[in-house]
Amino acid sequence: MGNPVEGVEYEDAHEEAERWVRGDRQADYYEQFLERSLENPLAAHGDGPLNKILKPEDMPWELSPQGLLKHMLNEDMAEELDYPGMGADMYQQVIPPGSHSGKHRHRGEEIVIVLEGEGYDHHWDAQLTVTGEQDREEPEWEFDDEPSKFEWEAGDAVYVPVNTIHQHHNTSEEDPARFISIQARAFTNLGFGYEDLEQFEAAPEYESDE
């Protein structure tokens, strides 16, 4: 079987719509997830909470050290809006033409889904050093001296490993780049996500706004 959406026309489509449909590879992951869920006695299969939609008006903007963010979901928002989405932290980020995000690291892994634009990431990967000292309260991490470069475009998904220092760059001088950042809430609840967040460099827009 070829591409299941081949032949579908996208009139006036955005760049992301033209790119994400590429590829013929298929899988049955969802059916496997469903089968395992039905066999799980602890899984809930009821109607669940009623408030399941967040509107753009519910999602606040923030000009942060990491850049311009539009928060889609986090623990504080879930409590304020009586929203059941407690499993993930998500925000959209917009990087102006020719600019870049701040540079930071957090203990939890992250997935970045590119919606618009093109650019690259710099990643300084982290290695956990085992010293044998049983009384050490915090693990010791060593970071690469030079970053690895990963180019991306609309439709791509970028994986940011645990504790990796990273920074996003928009290579277009005309168009903004926009992506969604997702991090599992479990890391945060265990103290391994945004509870362990370190900023090394601020986005230019944040610095100019100070």
Predicted regions and their residues:
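Short beta-strand His + acidic residue motifs that chelate non-heme Fe in jelly-roll/DSBH
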Residues: 101-104, 121-122, 149-151, 160, ...
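A short, N-terminal "cap"/entry segment at the start of jelly-roll beta-barrel domains
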Residues: 1-86, 194-199, 206-210
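Short acidic-glycine-tyrosine-enriched beta hairpin
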Residues: 113, 126-162
